[in-house]
């Protein structure tokens, strides 16, 4: 009996120690991420990035995303819902972070579509049909391009812009900013320059609503 009590006591102590250590680690990570964003506030958002919502909205959600990312596709309608729920108060800005193999060519398509004012229709189409142009977490650019051909878009201009220096520079800047901010996975969200340190849709909503309460 004494051995059983000793075993249980030891297990409880170890469990509590693990929980405490995990909490401390999470707190340290959150502090680090916030300090990193504060020290590099000028690279979180970039003028000219695709955006949706009122231009004068006081709340800006910046999303570093990969079009081949399944979680990004799942969050796409959820972020749209936030913008609709708070009209005029919230906008979203998209930053390219092509982590998946082959995604670099797909983000070039999106940026080329952006030059024609078709970024959002293109992104919606790609996310809605993501399983058709990705294989085992690898993007298939040819299939993605074929899909985008169904849009009312200048296809020849799209293909020209895809490989242009202008598009390449935008993507390079986004990737460099993501590296500076130590974005390691997508989607990564920032709300008014502050990182979402605990990932989740409910956590994102809470952060946005807190920002709205402060701004309005």
Where are these regions (language model features)?
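A short beta-strand-turn-helix
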Residues: 42-59, 84
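Short clusters of hydrophobic/aromatic residues that line enzyme substrate/ligand-binding pockets
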Residues: 50-52, 133, 196
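Ser/Thr/Pro/Gly-rich low-complexity linker/stalk segments immediately outside membranes or between
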Residues: 26-40
